[in-house]
Structures are given as C-alpha cells and as structure tokens.
C-alpha cells in the first residue's frame, strides 16, 4: 500500500468509529429496509456495450488529494442531469469528505436527479460502509484491492451481494488483478494512475487486458483525456470507461462527455 493510500485508509478507520457512534448498524439496517431497490449497475453497463457503444461511468468529483479543488462551481444535481442527457451509462460520486470534499448527500442528490445507477466512490474497508452505501442510495460500491486483504475483499463482496449492490473491484497491477479475479463480480476496474509516481498511463490497462477472462467487464479508470486514447482502448477490447476529472474541469461536463466518446 502506498503512503497516500495508507494515510487515507488510516483516516477512514477513525472516521468509521465516529460514524458508527452516531448511527449504529441496527439503525442503519432499519434505514436500508425503507429504501427503494437498487438500480441495475452491471445491467446498465452491459446494455450499452451490447449496443456497440462505450459504457461511460461519469464521475462527479469536486476535489482530489493530487489536484486540489477541481471544480468550484459544483452542483451534483445539474452535473448528474447533464451526464444523463449526454450518454452516460452510470454515475460515480465521490463521498469521501476529508480528501475529496465529497459527501453522502451529493450521491443521494445525484441519484434522485436522474435515472442512472450510481457507484459510491469511497474507501470501503468495513461491512458497515456497505450498508451505509445502500442506505444513502448507492447501486454499486468500489473495492480497492491495494487496501484490502483477500478475506476482507470476499467479506465485503458477500455483504454487497446480500444487498443487491454491484461491486467494482479496482486493481493497479498484475498481482492485484490475480487477487481480484478470485471475486465473483464481473466488473474489473483498472486504475491507470500509478499510486507511487502519481502519473497516469493507459498502457496499464492495455498491459493487463490479456490477463482478464472475456466474461468479465473491464472498466478503465483515470487519465483518459483524448479521443485517440478512447479509440486505442476500444480497439483493444475495453468496453467501459470511468472518467471524471476530464469532464469536471470543463464548463459543460455533459458536452465534454459527448465529445470524448460519441461525436
């Protein structure tokens, strides 16, 4: 685990204690019982790919540790609607407050504003957070292999499956990929950002792609900024793309999405 990821996870453990003190698991489970059924995240991705189109998971992100504030004019409702109107298959919403200036309320607001399934983009380390994701309206969660043991990955995936939540499992290298492939989820995310050097290279996805069984869905993440990169990845067989910063830095995120993938 890299220094920044270790720092984030350590802070997340402290935050988790505070959250559990404010709202116990039994209360959280009672809240989940009152929520509407999840939207089909995997189905939305598969449907777009079946049409021969890229499945774009469009991200709503205000800030990051590496870039600072990315978007000052930040309204998750209008951004979600803009993405939905310009071809996004799903949304990803940052909910980590300390490092990404995200919020659970942003996810709830974005989901209510459009019909798309929504991924909770956060650092999930405990089953409590899976129940929490379901309670705030998420349809999918992220599991980062670099931050979790095999036993933790399997436990968190099992909890997600019991709640009908999709799982996007994220890897950075071949060793992490082999661990991810032990899980049942079809969604394999390849993060092109090297957490040690903080550079992004789509070659990371291209290098790992041949190791992934065809029945899995490859989601390439981070650093996709040009139509040439999209064309290269599509030609290699990548069907799904998680993109955020490239859209968030523009005046009209939906237009940027359409230009990058569909014009």
Curated annotation (Swiss-Prot):
Pathway: Amino-acid biosynthesis; L-tryptophan biosynthesis; L-tryptophan from chorismate: step 4/5. The keyword Endoplasmic reticulum does not apply. It catalyses: 1-(2-carboxyphenylamino)-1-deoxy-D-ribulose 5-phosphate + H(+) = (1S,2R)-1-C-(indol-3-yl)glycerol 3-phosphate + CO2 + H2O. It is an enzyme of class 4 (lyase). GO terms for molecular function: indole-3-glycerol-phosphate synthase activity; phosphoribosylanthranilate isomerase activity. It comes from the Bacteria. SUPFAM superfamilies: Ribulose-phoshate binding barrel. CDD domains: IGPS. The keyword Lyase applies. Its EC number is 4.1.1.48. Coiled coil: none annotated. Keywords: Amino-acid biosynthesis, Aromatic amino acid biosynthesis, Decarboxylase, Lyase, Tryptophan biosynthesis. One of its GO terms (biological process) is L-tryptophan biosynthetic process. Belongs to the TrpC family. NCBIfam families: PRK00278.1-2, PRK00278.1-6, PRK00278.2-4. PANTHER family: INDOLE-3-GLYCEROL-PHOSPHATE SYNTHASE (PTHR22854:SF2), TRYPTOPHAN BIOSYNTHESIS PROTEIN (PTHR22854). This is Indole-3-glycerol phosphate synthase.
